[in-house]
Amino acid sequence: MNRALAILGLLVTTAACDRARPLEQVEPSQLAIGARVEIRTDTVGLDQHARAATFALVDADNLGDRPATVTLGGVLVDADGHEVGRLRAETLWIPPRGRRTFALVDDADQPRPAAVAARIDVRGATRPRHEPPVAIEQGHVWKDGDRVVATAMVVNSSDRPCQAVVLAGFHDRDGAPMTRPFSVFPIGAGIERPARFVGPSGSTTGYIFVGKIRC
């Protein structure tokens, strides 16, 4: 019994030390922010939280061989380069050699009719200690008329029920981001659920990924 308690104490101490150790920073050379930043004004949020706001769609690539947790922010600017609004920062997990599409919303949740571009900056980038408990598997994309459809399985590999924000990124033939729809998925421990997103007219590529997770 004493031996078992000693081992348990060692494991708890090791886990606590692991949490206390600062996360490794990602070298700037290991990240690439997309040159195409698309400005949109549309409905954001769900149900009673839905509202019209201006946002910027931009891709970030993890060029390294390890996962990265990346936070982007920025400002909206008018045709003269003057700031007309700030963008709320967003954090996403990016797999090795992977890409994620960010949707940075005006931090006052307001339409900005004068906004024609955005200046994007990296607010933070670290190497996560663990893989996320919810992941995407069996991703498929196919053409449906003048758009594409993306499907996948959302898999909870943990022993606890989770709630995950599942998103999709759709791009046009030139690689510009077009839309980033999302849905909130409650998913039980060890369960997988199908996800399906339909891209906008003119979309040629699409993919599904996981955003915020709460378990």
Task: Give, region by region, the residue ranges found by the protein language model.
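Post-signal peptide N-terminal segment of mature Sec-exported envelope proteins
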Residues: 24-46
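C-terminal motif of bacterial Sec signal peptides marking the signal peptidase cleavage site
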Residues: 13-16
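Asparagine-centered strand-capping/turn motif at beta-strand->loop junctions
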Residues: 60-64, 154-158
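Short, solvent-exposed loop/turn segments enriched in Ser/Thr/Gly
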Residues: 51-57, 145-151
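Bacterial N-terminal signal peptides that target proteins for export
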Residues: 1-6
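Intrinsically disordered, low-complexity Pro/Gly/Ser/Thr-rich segments with frequent PxxP/GP/PP motifs
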Residues: 84-111, 178-203
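Short beta-strand and strand-turn-strand segments in soluble, beta-rich domains
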Residues: 67-71, 78-88, 130-133, 173-182
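Terminal connector regions
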Residues: 21-24, 101-149, 180-181, 201-215
